[in-house]
Amino acid sequence: MCPLRSLLLISTLVLLHHLPHLSLGRSLPITTAGPGRSCLDYSQNLLRAVSNTLQKARQTLEFYSCTSEEIDHEDITKDKTSTVEACLPLELATNESCLASRETSLITNGHCLASGKTSFMTTLCLRSIYKDLKMYHMEFQAINAKLLMDPKRQVSLDQNMLAAIAELMQALNFDSETVPQKPSLEELDFYKTKVKLCILLHAFRIRAVTIDRMMSYLSSS
């Protein structure tokens, strides 16, 4: 029989993937000890940072259709990464059974697993998370550069969020990875830029919840 914890995790990941409009204010219980604690700290910090940034943006841009119900949801990682699929628990990712072996392992350079040794599937998961973070980091930097040119200076990105993304990327340590996307080069329209910011923040918060749940799972495994 499949471990109940694995089934709960995959149910959550699939739900987050297909229902982006859900409210995600609560997190799954986490374990504070064991391997992966460092990256769990970073993922929790990232989730707090993006949640705070989104809340501030919704308050500042209340006339820009910045609520979850008003925006057009967009996933910039679609067809470019496969984090939900890559982060399936190994028990559910092999031959559709719960008898998968954990013997296959790789040596990783990151700090998300205390031993530095992890399964092939876990490495794929962490690499996909890194690519997600890198894509969003590039997009947020491009948007922030435009916002800083706005004479009104109505809103700008919280540097704490950008720092939180960078910290988790550094901990994952897949520096050689390339991402299949460059920041979009649109005309300098500050209204569209602010709407785009709202769209990205909502999407990234959902992804941050997924990442936090996955780090919690790895930490307690």
Curated annotation (Swiss-Prot):
Glycans are attached at residue 95. Disulfide bonds join 39-112, 66-198, 87-125. It is found in: Secreted. Keywords: Cytokine, Disulfide bond, Glycoprotein, Growth factor, Secreted, Signal. One of its GO terms (cellular component) is extracellular space. Residues 1-25 form the signal peptide. One of its GO terms (biological process) is immune response. One of its GO terms (molecular function) is cytokine activity. Belongs to the IL-6 superfamily. This is Interleukin-12 subunit alpha.
